[in-house]
Regions:
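Active-site-proximal acidic secondary-structure segment that organizes catalysis
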Residues: 2-12, 123-126, 142-144, 148-205, ...
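Gly/Ser/Thr-rich phosphate-binding loops and adjoining beta-strand/alpha-helix segments
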Residues: 24-37, 59-79, 143-163, 246-311, ...
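Short amphipathic alpha-helical segments
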Residues: 77-88, 136, 179, 183, ...
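A short N-terminal helical cap/helix-turn-helix that marks the beginning
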Residues: 97, 186-201, 228-239, 438-473
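Short, low-complexity Ser/Thr-rich regulatory SLiMs
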Residues: 98-100, 152-156, 416-420
Length: 473
């Protein structure tokens, strides 16, 4: 399966290390690049603002997403250099730098991507701890253009490749695309048959379309009304972790834990239960999250944020960049019946997915919280993401892993991941004593709920059968 973990859990082994970073000439070209009137995407803008404010406070915040995989044999450095540079030149998210001040964010863009060059540097033999430390500390910060680096660790009969990318230019889907891009290109080059890669789309064009779409909204637009309805419904109780995490203001240290929720047979049974209830896998996941929240809080309605991959079309689906954006889901608990909750969750999921195109910040640009009659969040948020890695099953042979830096924003991110042969949950959390205890307690409850949903009792089965009959009539 595709591994999800922290940089600290990554096991690249020990051996000679080679890294790829921007050449001095490329940095100079970017420093002299002309100003580009196109603002960053809304995802990038928020990330840049967070990085700017964190730098002023002397704090580190989560930012790095690393894809790593293994390749048999001895690395051909020249071929890997070509593969990495082709990847960077293919995806224009890497072609812009952002100058951030307290008042503005200005983009600068290189007009000829062929002038960008990443060059290899041999660092010699390094131990595993040294490698992890280097990868975490040597990638330039979010406010620097070249906040993405690559590397290889050579072993006796194989090597490990990594691409360590700031979130400014990547998301969960991008991690898989980066692996496919570089790995397929490299394999083609060493075999003497250059890979035929699919067409990509411009991330800059995505940002332009996003700006036009958002700025066209008014208080009478459906997305704005739907966001306001959700905010009013929460009544200040915005999506957050249901268990205490301790004092998260002292440190931004974070942890990541991954455990199995369902084995292969249970995953199939869970999917069948969702379908029989008139929902999909995503509706069942949200129903289970709602039941877990209810066990801790007793809340009658569960509110959550979940990300949507806003890529559209074949070319954009193959493009690296930060396309993922959050939208809200609300699930009434009722009497706790999984089938009913799955249908309600699916209905909310499908009805609100369009809100991923419009950030909630747009609502506040149009009116104040007082004018809208809403109460804003007072604690760090919680996200529940559903990811489907079945399409990456072939990457199992290369031990593909996605690794996050050991930092936390103070809230909780949860990824429910469907693999070819199991379902796992990964949670990133503030690394406090209370946080560690609470997260492990939460996961234990969540595992029990998923397992129970995969083995419905007779009453539940009767209810599903009745619904299925009525639905087919």
């Amino acid at each position: 399966m595709v591994t999800i973990g922290s940089h600290g859990s990554w096991q690249p082994g020990r051996g000679p290390m080679t890294t790829w970073t921007a050449s001095p000439a490329s940095r100079e070209i970017m420093a002299r690049a002309e100003s580009d009137p196109m603002p960053p995407s809304f995802q990038q803008e928020q990330h840049l603002r967070t990085a700017y404010n964190a730098k002023a406070l002397g704090r580190n915040v989560p930012r790095l997403i690393m894809a790593a995989w293994d390749v048999d044999g001895w690395c051909d450095v020249a071929a890997m250099t070509d593969a990495i540079n082709l990847h960077i030149r293919r995806h224009d998210t890497y072609h812009s730098a952002f100058d951030v001040t307290a008042d503005a964010i200005t983009r600068r863009t290189i007009d000829n991507a062929d002038r960008i060059e990443f060059i290899p540097t041999s660092l010699g033999f390094m131990e595993e701890d040294e490698i992890r430390h280097h990868v975490l500390t040597a990638t330039p910060g979010t406010l620097e253009w070249d906040c993405f680096t690559f590397g290889v660790i050579q072993k006796a009969d194989s090597f490990t490749v990594y691409a360590n990318i700031d979130h400014l230019h990547t998301d969960g889907t991008s991690a898989g695309l980066i692996y496919q891009d570089i790995h397929l290109t490299y394999q083609g080059l060493v075999a003497g048959r250059p890979a035929s890669l699919p067409q990509t789309s411009s991330y800059r064009d995505f940002a332009a379309h996003q700006r036009d779409q958002v700025e066209a909204t008014t208080l009478d637009s459906r997305p704005i009304k739907d966001w306001v309805d959700f905010a009013r419904e929460t009544d200040g109780d915005w999506p957050s972790f249901p268990v205490e995490l301790g004092d998260t203001s002292i440190s931004t240290a974070g942890g990541v834990v991954t455990v199995e929720l369902l084995n292969d047979d249970q995953t199939q049974a869970f999917n069948n239960a969702c379908r029989a209830a008139g929902a999909r896998f995503s509706g069942g996941v949200m129903a289970c999250a709602a039941l877990a929240d209810h066990q801790f809080t007793g809340a009658e309605t569960y509110h959550s944020f979940t990300p949507s991959d806003t890529r559209s079309g074949d070319a954009q689906s193959m493009s690296a960049g930060w396309y993922a954006s959050l939208f809200p889901v609300s699930v009434p608990v009722g009497d706790g019946d999984f089938a009913q909750m799955s249908r309600a969750a699916q209905k909310s999921f499908d009805a609100n997915k369009h809100l991923s195109a419009i950030p909630f910040r747009r609502v506040l640009d149009l009116a104040s919280p007082e004018e809208l009659g809403v109460t804003l969040a007072s604690q760090p948020s919680m996200m529940v993401s559903l990811m489907d890695f079945r399409a990456l099953a072939a990457a199992d042979a290369n031990h593909l892993g996605i690794y996050l830096d050991n930092l936390s924003h103070g809230g909780i991110n949860t990824w429910i991941i469907r693999h070819a042969d199991q379902t796992t949950v990964t949670v990133s959390f503030p690394d406090t004593a209370e946080g560690r205890h609470s997260v492990h307690n939460y996961i234990a409850v969540l595992r029990g709920i998923f397992a129970e949903a995969a083995e419905p009792n007779a009453d539940w089965a009767d209810e599903v059968a009745d619904h299925a009959f009525a639905h087919s009539a």
